[in-house]
Amino acid sequence: MSVREADDPQLFARVQEQNLLRQYDLLANCVEIALKKGIEAFHKYMLWSLNASAVANIAQFGGRFREQPIYVGNHIPPHFKDVPNLMDQFISVIHEMWTLEPHPTILPAYALWRLNWIHPFIEGNGRTARAACYLLICLRQGTLLPGKKIVPERIR
């Protein structure tokens, strides 16, 4: 069951706002776990969870890799059959480079770009990529970044 923006824009907006709040709460939990376990806590199951929370009730197939072609503007993402292998390679690169690249934003920026380039999910790729980027920045800094939740204020 899902609501489409075209069918009920106000309900869609409310569901999307709640999803973003839930995704942030899940992300804070993921950061806490990663701070205890290190970079090994960054894996595809975490990404699946972050994606599922971002698109719950607004898209089918949340939290799993796409099994169909998609088109994103002028970018044609890799074939869906290549996505699982590309994601395994992506995770491996993050793990391998973690100790080799100490700069606080290079790997998070790479993660943001690479996830959006692979476009592993049907919906919510940008939200999932931004969450992954944030998690890696927090892990590199050794703390959940200070501040307040601003998601609802920004999307209203």
Spell out what each predicted region is:
Residues M1-R156:
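FIC/Doc superfamily catalytic core
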